[in-house]
């Protein structure tokens, strides 16, 4: 019999393995394997215990704990929580309006009695609709709900009114176009009006236009004078023309073939 020490990777776990002389290698391997399993179980238990300890430590932080739904006692913490929750509430309301097209009105008073509101399209319009709906009597609501003919008549009247409004809009647009055209035409010939009827802006525009017209006339006159001088200067130069000489008739004399100077 001899004793051997079986040591796991963990330095704190060490077991003496007693081996008898008559034991075979298979028995020794089996005992070693069972010890290895024991060490692995102890290691897994220790790892699980470590994880539980770490999780318990994490739960101690405020961010990981579940906040109880009771009034916050400390005033500064209560004010900070109100600001954060109010911003989150308004953000969720805005998302609901954007996604679903809902009309929402929210009024919140802070612990310091300061009001904050959020509304789409506005708080006033939502409140007006709510108040007007509550002021409607039960008999009127039942009458509207119980008479389909009245609802159909109201829809027809609404359609007729909307069509009239659309026609009036078209007429208004046409009149606006006519007014703009009239103003444009009056602005084109505004200088034909008497000077006494012009305002300061029109007088300044007329002065500027006359100055520009004078510059244009002077420039054109200078160009015209230069062209005139060139033409008349060319005409003033004398051009000598050889005198006509009477020569006897004949083909050779007319075309001067005799001298070899014929010109066609």
Swiss-Prot record:
Swiss-Prot/TrEMBL GO biological process terms: embryo sac central cell differentiation; positive regulation of transcription by RNA polymerase II
Tissue distribution: Expressed exclusively in the central cell of the female gametophyte and in early endosperm.
Keyword Magnesium in annotation: no
Name assigned to this protein: Agamous-like MADS-box protein AGL61
Keywords, alphabetical: DNA-binding, Nucleus, Transcription, Transcription regulation
Other noteworthy facts: Plants lacking AGL61 show a reduced size of the central cell and a reduced or absent central cell vacuole. When fertilized, the central cell fails to give rise to endosperm and the embryo sac degenerates. However, mutated female gametophytesol are not defective in pollen tube guidance and the synergid function is not impaired.
Listed GO MF terms: DNA-binding transcription factor activity; protein dimerization activity; RNA polymerase II transcription regulatory region sequence-specific DNA binding
Domain called MADS-box: residue spans: 62-122
Gene3D superfamilies documented for this protein: 6.10.140.920, Transcription factor, MADS-box (3.40.1810.10)
Alphabetical list of Pfam families matching this protein: SRF-TF
PROSITE patterns: MADS_BOX_2
């Amino acid at each position: 019999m001899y004793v051997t020490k079986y040591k796991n990777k963990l330095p704190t776990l060490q077991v003496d393995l007693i081996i008898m002389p008559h034991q075979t290698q298979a028995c020794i391997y089996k005992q070693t394997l069972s010890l290895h399993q024991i060490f692995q179980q102890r290691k897994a238990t220790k790892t699980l215990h470590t994880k539980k300890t770490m999780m318990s430590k994490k739960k101690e932080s405020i961010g990981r704990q579940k906040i109880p739904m009771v009034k916050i006692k400390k005033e500064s913490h209560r004010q900070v929580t109100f600001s954060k929750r109010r911003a989150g509430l308004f953000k969720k309301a805005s998302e609901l309006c954007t996604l679903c097209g809902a009309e929402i009105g929210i009024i919140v008073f802070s612990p310091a009695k300061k009001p904050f509101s959020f509304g789409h399209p506005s708080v006033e319009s939502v409140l007006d609709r709510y108040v007007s709906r509550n002021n409607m009597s039960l008999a009127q609501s039942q009458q509207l709900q119980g008479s389909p003919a009245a609802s159909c008549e109201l829809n027809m009247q609404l359609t007729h009114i909307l069509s009239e409004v659309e026609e009036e809009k078209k007429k208004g647009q046409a009149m606006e176009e006519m007014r703009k055209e009239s103003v444009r035409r009056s602005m084109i010939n505004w200088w034909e009006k008497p000077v006494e009827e012009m305002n300061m802006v029109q007088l300044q525009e007329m002065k500027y236009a006359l100055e520009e017209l004078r510059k244009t006339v002077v420039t054109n006159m200078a160009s015209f004078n230069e062209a005139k001088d060139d033409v008349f200067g060319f005409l003033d130069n004398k051009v000598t023309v050889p005198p006509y000489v009477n020569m006897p008739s004949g083909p050779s004399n007319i075309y001067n073939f005799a001298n070899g100077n014929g010109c066609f």
